[in-house]
């Protein structure tokens, strides 16, 4: 079983995804750079987790699972 993401990671990711919907793609590396530009997160681990969740949100939106 996988780990559950912490609430603040989901909250920040959703806020970024809703505020800048056209900035993110299915590419994790691209999203990682965008998270670095758009936030003041200094931790590499937290940045990567936020970017990973945003990548998941983009994929879910494209598949029609979220609006």
Curated annotation (Swiss-Prot):
One of its GO terms (biological process) is translation. The keyword Coiled coil does not apply. InterPro entries: Ribosomal_eS17, Ribosomal_eS17_CS, Ribosomal_eS17_sf. GO terms for molecular function: structural constituent of ribosome. It comes from the Archaea. Disulfide bonds: none annotated. Keywords: Ribonucleoprotein, Ribosomal protein. One of its GO terms (cellular component) is ribosome. Belongs to the eukaryotic ribosomal protein eS17 family. This is Small ribosomal subunit protein eS17. It comes from Pyrococcus horikoshii (strain ATCC 700860 / DSM 12428 / JCM 9974 / NBRC 100139 / OT-3).
